[in-house]
From Swiss-Prot:
Gene name for this UniProt entry: ini1
Source organism superkingdom: Eukaryota
Compartments, as annotated in UniProt: Nucleus
Protein name from the UniProt record: Pre-mRNA-splicing factor ini1
Alphabetized InterPro entries for the sequence: PHF5
Keyword terms, alphabetized: mRNA processing, mRNA splicing, Nucleus, Spliceosome
Predominant location: nucleus
Role, per record: Required for pre-mRNA splicing.
A Pfam cross-reference name: PHF5
GO cellular component: cytosol; nucleus; precatalytic spliceosome; U2 snRNP
Family, as annotated: Belongs to the PHF5 family.
Biological-process GO terms, alphabetical: mRNA cis splicing, via spliceosome; mRNA splicing, via spliceosome
Amino acid sequence: MSKHHPDLVLCRRQPGITVGKLCERCDEKCPICDSHVRPTTLVRICDECAFGSSQDRCIICGAPGVSDCYYCSECTRMEYDRDGCPRVINLGSSRTDWFYERKKFKNAGKEMPGATY
C-alpha cells in the first residue's frame, strides 16, 4: 500500500504479538506492496494499534477485520516484514479531499458523482 500511495503514514513501532487483520475488500493483500501472490509471513502489529477501538480492524482501511494478514514472499525476502508495525495511521490526501468534496455536495443538496466508498 505504501508503494502506491506515498502520502500514507505507517505506524512503524516495534511489533508485538498481535496478528494484523484485513477486511473483505483488502483480503489477501500484502500491506506493503498490495500484491495478491504467495502470502508467507504473518503480520504482527504493535500493542498500541491492537488496543481499544482499533482492535480487530483492518490495518489498511480500518473496516472490521475478517482474516489474518500476511506479507508476500517478496516483501519477506526484502525484509520489509522487519521494518515495524505496518498499520496505516492517516487516510491520505485523496481520501481526505474526497470526504470534504462529498460534504460540500451534501450541503448543496446534490448527489456526489463517481464511486462511493
